[in-house]
Amino acid sequence: MQKKIETVQTLLEALPFIKEFRGKTVVIKYGGSAQETPQLKEKFAEDILLMYLVGIKPVIVHGGGRQINEMLDALKIESKFIEGQRVTSKEVMRIVEMVLSGEINKEIVSLLNSHGAKAIGISGKDAHFISAKAKDFSRWGLTGNITDVKADVISNLIAEKFIPVIAPIAAGGEMGHPGFNINADLCASYVAKAIGAHKIIFLTDTAGVLNNSKELFSTLTKAEVEALKADGTIHGGMVPKVDACLEAIEGGVAKAHIIDGRIEHSMLLELFTSAGVGTQITI
């Protein structure tokens, strides 16, 4: 009986948050271990389905760097990085699109649909809903910066009760252009801004933003993030994550969250509990 009472208490604790977020759009950047470990994939699908069933409108943007590297290695195609960004030749771009749009995207869609969701997979090339230009073609090739997002493409899918699953590939301007490889974190931020999302959540392989004693910051403002970047507390791979958060909140998204995707049901813990489990960033 006690266990049943505790279950009800858990549901009651979540109720105010369900009321608050019902009808709101939440963009999720899906990557890291959560995207690669079979058990975590299942938990992710369960979380998305629960969010969907209580009236939240999830939009998923996924990465796939490890899988791209594995395919390039298998095909013996060289791939370099400059300042942490992949140099995307035309040959590499073909593999990037094949892995992101043809393999990973379809796997996520199938996983969600097998759990009873109504997911649909697209890339930024579909309906040219994400346009981009070269970041610096002489250095990074077909690695791009987003110039435009057609929000109505996603809004129309949401209105039809679909869960959009987006591969971070953007269209080029010219006919026959091979497209652009887009950083998935920034792709998620630009999509969140364009569609007026209430929240954006980044699933990572770290607990969130940590101080120099490896303790978690539960909440940070934009000014605090900038100060922590300036003094070196935020460094390395966390810098592009917080930059993507700032991009989103500066564009009107109410809150950005960096959470540990290695924790089962971390999205539900962040959304539906008072304490949360990661770092929340606000203006």
Swiss-Prot record:
Biological process per Gene Ontology, one example term: arginine biosynthetic process via ornithine
Family of this protein: Belongs to the acetylglutamate kinase family. ArgB subfamily.
Biological role stated in the UniProt entry: Catalyzes the ATP-dependent phosphorylation of N-acetyl-L-glutamate.
The protein's name in its UniProt record: Acetylglutamate kinase
Catalytically driven reaction(s): N-acetyl-L-glutamate + ATP = N-acetyl-L-glutamyl 5-phosphate + ADP
Organism this protein belongs to: Sulfurimonas denitrificans (strain ATCC 33889 / DSM 1251)
Entries under Pfam families matching the protein: AA_kinase
GO MF annotation, one: acetylglutamate kinase activity
Presence of the UniProt keyword Iron-sulfur in the record: no
Superkingdom of this protein's organism: Bacteria
PANTHER family for this protein: N-ACETYLGLUTAMATE SYNTHASE, N-ACETYLGLUTAMATE SYNTHASE, MITOCHONDRIAL
